[in-house]
Amino acid sequence: MADHKFLSIRGAREHNLKNVDLDLPRDSLIVMTGLSGSGKSSLAFDTIYAEGQRRYVESLSAYARQFLEMMQKPDVDQIDGLSPAISIEQKTTSKNPRSTVGTVTEIYDYMRLLFARVGVPYSPATGLPIESQTVSQMVDRVLALEEGTRLFLLAPIVRGRKGEYRKELLELQKKGFQRVKVDGVFYEIADVPALDKKYKHDIDVVVDRIVVRGDLATRLADSIETALKLAEGLAVAEFADKPLDSSQTGEDSVNKSKNETHERILFSEKFACPVSGFTIPEIEPRLFSFNNPFGACPTCDGLGSQRAIDPNLVVPDENVSLRDGAVSPWAKSTSPYYVQTLEALGKAYNFKLGDKFKDLSAEAQDAILRGTGEREVTFQYDDGLRSYKTTKTFEGVIPNLERRWKETESAWMREEIERFMSATPCPVCKGYRLKPEALAVKIGGKHIGEVTEQSIRNADKWFTDLPAQLNDKQNEIAVRVLKEIRERLRFLNDVGLDYLTLSRNSGTLSGGESQRIRLASQIGSGLTGVLYVLDEPSIGLHQRDNTRLLDTLKHLRDIGNTVIVVEHDEDAILHADYVVDMGPAAGIHGGEIIAQGTPQQVMANPNSITGKYLSGALEVATPGVRREAKKNRRLKIVGARGNNLKNVTAEIPLGTFTAVTGVSGGGKSTFLIETLFKAASRRIMGSREHPAEHDRIEGLEFLDKVIDIDQSPIGRTPRSNPATYTGAFTPIRDWFAGLPEAKARGYQPGRFSFNVKGGRCEACQGDGVIKIEMHFLPDVYVTCDVCHGKRYNRETLDVLFKGKSIADVLDMTVEEGVDFFAAVPGVRDKLDTLKQVGLGYIHIGQQATTLSGGEAQRIKLAKELSRKATGKTLYILDEPTTGLHFHDVAKLLEVLHELVDQGNTVVVIEHNLEVIKTADWVLDLGPEGGDGGGELVAQGTPEAIVREKRSYTGQFLKELLERRPGGKREAAE
């Protein structure tokens, strides 16, 4: 029998791997590291995970396989010792608005069960609990009263409804009932006065008169059953000798029955408020699901929000006059109608078109936006052809847009109007997504919506304290459910997500956050003997929380799993049981194993660049001198209050490299992206983005452009590639079209595009492959047998430059392209910027869909580098070191500092201390995440941050600045 202490890989050749042989210890924490593009993901995901998943899925029936995504068999000779594999990547966040942190982690499913089994419904009218009781419980409740207590047992058949009820009273008499209580007075049925049908009445039937004593159980049960049948599940026991004083009786108190003249006990065999009639169907878990019509708020369909016209988007800048376009939907229209409408309103409400919108009276602003109500205004219109006068009410800009949005059948018009809409909390469910019936059910004074609004840290405490508020029976029911909930909350705490709320939409999470959520779910599942493959779980995590994440990964290992992590984080590498260092460089220059073994063995290996950075032999240099703000110009953000920001005022010196730091959930993205970027792009670039709440931003006049270089894909189709995105493909096509052979044939640049007819291969339409659907086997992509994967037809491929066709050029790496086009500056310079940002290894025509987030971000950066510098641009980057090795970080910093040296301002959100230590200025937000964050903890140079006791960033930075002396800005080579 084979010994499976190792995971043995033989002859791995996927992508750039060069026939790799490797033995990995099972049940260990293994970190794969190395330069970007060196083959880490090819080995971990495309070989080991793909084969583990493929073998598991192949063991299922053909029927089951058709529902599962099948993996291609990787290019590898043999893998032994493989377990079923689970991959946790960053890309798979659900953008579905119905997906929340609670639903993704399954905590919400357990909460629904808890509220269905232990929750107590409360009447919205009285605030009192509504309980469903059996007849036996009702009998016991009466018999528990003091012996000799005199009671009337009543059936409330009419509660607060208009009518005469003659027919109903006659029916009761026929059934043998003799007395009723009508509007607070007892009558023989024959003597009931005629009731006025215009008024609301209360009628209770007297079913029995009782004096409490021990032998009453059988009679009482019969009488209660009779009352419940008559009153559709309700019964009342009224104390004959305990009248209420006048302040408590029906006439003077809201929602009470006029018959409530004495103290009474209300019984309900349904969940129904005996006072207001508010009823709840049987309480089941589906009542608390906002994805089920049984529980979802009918107004917003369980989304918690509605799109409505936003006055702040209709009038984006109140400092603009009406003539200059303060009313945005009307600003670009050439029709005289809108100006003449405003002139007429101006006469009626005493304003001129030259007035700024903010200087108009509240009444005038309201008339423009929401209409004149019942007040009529005289309008005079002249369109050049005819002139006419009319007196009418004015609808208002907002109601007009809302009406047109509902009535139009034009998709274009709908889209145009939607630019002035924003999501607002649903007015009925207040954003909780559920029906009133579901929100009436409470545990410990909170309904399910209020519990999900808490941060994970606070929810953990609430669920821990909950058993003390429950009775013995409730605790017995809840014990297992609470255990599951608390375990999952604890795991979320452990991976540094304690600041998130359970109601947070999962589409708004960063890649690192969503990956750690799935990691917490996996730990909750408690599987053993599994192979986990993770892709940089430390992304977006502050150094402070790194230890908790590593403890989580070690826990997965300790319960009997093999954990493979693709990671660049120094702590993760040093805590690994086994490290595999890929290299020596990227792309075609990588794909080999440079070093493997314990972290110490890798550090001792002279060939390992990773080892040199870990041991301190190589380092990202700390600059000797920090830049000052150019000409003392600064951006000042005043009173930022978005999300959890607490009135933050901070400065960013222009012409410097600034890092925004702080623990996860501290408010960095809200401050930089939601506030600064959106406000700046609105003011400078004229975008329609709506910034988070803030007072003002000073200093924007010194900028002419603001660019957010994010990690979203550069294209969503295989036809998009680095050459098309950076604009290098246009000069390449122009160059080929200018060659003598092409001119002789009359070819234009379009001949060399694989997107249009003419030069492309029509058999595969320029894709190079043909997709064949195989149903319960994976789709097979077969190389086109006409062009053999070249994408172009034979005639186009006949045009050669230096012996290479256009297809050969697209297949080159960027590095090869720079040398090949050395004499063609238009192409060389664009490709050279890609090489500068460390992407020399990618292919010029590589499909955009195969690029990682970090690679996409650096391609965007390269595009910016190739533009003509104005020296007045603000560049914003969110964690640009994602997916970067120490050595790549050093190269990236050179590029970012080059942008700053041109006079631009670069601001990054970053946790990587190697980047933070090279910054000229640091803004540290926090001190904690979520509710405990949102403050400016410190701002200044890295040295100033180190001196701030409350700053977690400062504490970790201090170690680094003390450990490594200052040097030149250049990265170590």
From Swiss-Prot:
Coiled coil: none annotated. It is found in: Cytoplasm. CDD domains: ABC_UvrA_I, ABC_UvrA_II. One of its GO terms (cellular component) is cytoplasm. ATP binds at residues 34-41, 662-669. It holds the Pfam family UvrA_inter. GO terms for biological process: nucleotide-excision repair; SOS response. InterPro entries: ABC_transporter-like_ATP-bd, ABC_transporter-like_CS, ATP_grasp_subdomain_1, P-loop_NTPase, UvrA, UvrA_DNA-bd, UvrA_inter. Its main location: cytoplasm. Signal peptide: none annotated. A zinc finger (C4-type) spans 761-787. Keywords: ATP-binding, Cytoplasm, DNA damage, DNA excision, DNA repair, DNA-binding, Excision nuclease, Metal-binding, Nucleotide-binding, Repeat, SOS response, Zinc, Zinc-finger. GO terms for molecular function: ATP binding; ATP hydrolysis activity; DNA binding; excinuclease ABC activity; zinc ion binding. Residues 330-609, 629-958 form the ABC transporter domain. Forms a heterotetramer with UvrB during the search for lesions. PANTHER family: UVRABC SYSTEM PROTEIN A. Belongs to the ABC transporter superfamily. UvrA family. The UvrABC repair system catalyzes the recognition and processing of DNA lesions. UvrA is an ATPase and a DNA-binding protein. A damage recognition complex composed of 2 UvrA and 2 UvrB subunits scans DNA for abnormalities. When the presence of a lesion has been verified by UvrB, the UvrA molecules dissociate. This is UvrABC system protein A. It comes from Mesorhizobium japonicum (strain LMG 29417 / CECT 9101 / MAFF 303099).
